[in-house]
């Protein structure tokens, strides 16, 4: 099946799929679950300038979102879990069996494997007796080689057991993680479920289909949307997508002016047809997270939205065009600006920068919409006031 869309229709489809235009598709606690289930996962990043990435993803599209809602779903209700997918991520706990192969790989490979293996039973015994523990509770201060830099043996062992699925995160205090035995928090039926994938290739295709649905549209090529999908570097993505298309799990989308076709999940065809029938959606204004699912694929962003975005957090200050933690601003069906909000002292959300895109005029309607979005973000961050730097006027 092939659908022919204009670029405007492609934008409309993506934005409605993500709940960023029209009446809210995702509301409250259930809305968080619904969006994460639709997306497969949302990416986690611990940096918190004005909310962590996962929180920013949700605040832009879930009506009534609060940070405690997400914490409760993760650490109280256990309907969501934080684990690897597209890097560190949050995904529905019911998907646990589908990651069996990833957990098994962490049992086969890993840095400082001998030291970690020797310490594992001691760590498990400590947690079994004392309950949720962090790396500082274990007294294993020997430094070992680890993924980002040398670290304490306690941290390396806890993280390995977590990667293997023997531990889960019980809760966090800031960036400090407390781990507990998985069997205390996840249903036995999930922990004991067999791997639903018949083989590695079936597993790869499951992940590829999931990532296509997460963004909404993808071409049969490598992109950051497929990070951490096994065999992405060996042409596996294209092969998987063509097989999924042949099986009717993907549909082809030809966008006006773009030679290479895109693909969408077959589950989303009703929305494509709604857009083709002429549906129009009420415009909204939203600040988009730097690792938001919608913008995982920068080529898609350029082709469909005519917008180029670089997260400048790792760019030296002297070389930045914008700011340390700058968020794209979506207004209606266009990315119209970039904004740098920072949660400061005294319950104030400070707007350190606002840069309108070329050709965008600072109309009263636009600037009022940006200000309302800033106030919503301030509220989510527990800030009572929004302040603009002198050079930033709204």
How would you label these PLM feature ranges?
Residues 1-286, 292-293, 300, 307-311, ...:
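Long, low-complexity intrinsically disordered regions
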């Amino acid at each position: 099946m092939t659908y022919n869309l204009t670029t405007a229709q492609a934008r409309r489809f993506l934005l409605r799929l993500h709940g960023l235009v029209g009446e809210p598709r995702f509301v409250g606690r259930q809305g968080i679950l619904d969006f994460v289930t639709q997306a497969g996962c949302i990416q986690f990043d611990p940096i918190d300038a004005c909310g962590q990435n996962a929180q920013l993803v949700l605040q832009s599209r879930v009506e009534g979102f609060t940070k405690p809602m997400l914490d409760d779903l993760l650490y109280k209700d256990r309907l969501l879990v934080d684990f690897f997918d597209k890097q560190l991520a949050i995904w529905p706990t019911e998907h646990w069996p589908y990651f069996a192969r990833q957990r098994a790989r962490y049992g086969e490979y890993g840095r400082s494997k001998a030291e970690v293996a020797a310490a594992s039973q001691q760590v498990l015994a400590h947690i079994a007796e004392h309950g949720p523990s962090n790396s500082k509770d274990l007294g294993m201060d020997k430094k070992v080689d680890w993924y980002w830099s040398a670290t304490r043996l306690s941290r390396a062992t806890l993280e390995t057991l977590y990667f293997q699925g023997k531990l889960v995160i019980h809760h966090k205090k800031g960036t400090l993680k407390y781990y507990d035995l998985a069997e205390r928090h996840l249903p036995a039926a999930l922990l004991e479920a067999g791997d639903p994938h018949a083989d590695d290739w079936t597993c790869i295709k499951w992940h590829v289909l999931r990532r296509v649905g997460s963004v909404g549209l993808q071409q049969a090529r490598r992109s950051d949307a497929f990070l951490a999908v096994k065999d992405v570097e060996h042409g596996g993505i294209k092969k998987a997508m063509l097989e999924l298309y042949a099986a009717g799990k993907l549909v082809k989308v030809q966008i006006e002016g773009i030679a290479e076709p895109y693909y969408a999940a077959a589950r989303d065809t009703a929305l494509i047809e709604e857009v083709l029938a002429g549906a129009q959606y009420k415009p909204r204004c939203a600040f988009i997270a730097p690792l938001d699912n919608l913008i995982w694929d920068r080529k898609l962003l350029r082709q469909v939205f005519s917008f180029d975005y670089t997260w400048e957090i790792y760019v030296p200050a002297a070389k930045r065009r914008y700011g340390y933690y700058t968020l794209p601003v979506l207004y209606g069906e266009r990315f119209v600006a970039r904004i740098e909000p920072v949660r400061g002292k005294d319950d104030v959300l400070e707007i350190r920068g606002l840069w309108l895109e070329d050709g965008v005029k600072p109309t009263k309607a636009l600037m009022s919409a940006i200000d309302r979005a800033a106030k919503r973000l301030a509220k989510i961050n527990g800030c009572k006031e929004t302040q603009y730097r002198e050079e930033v006027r709204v």
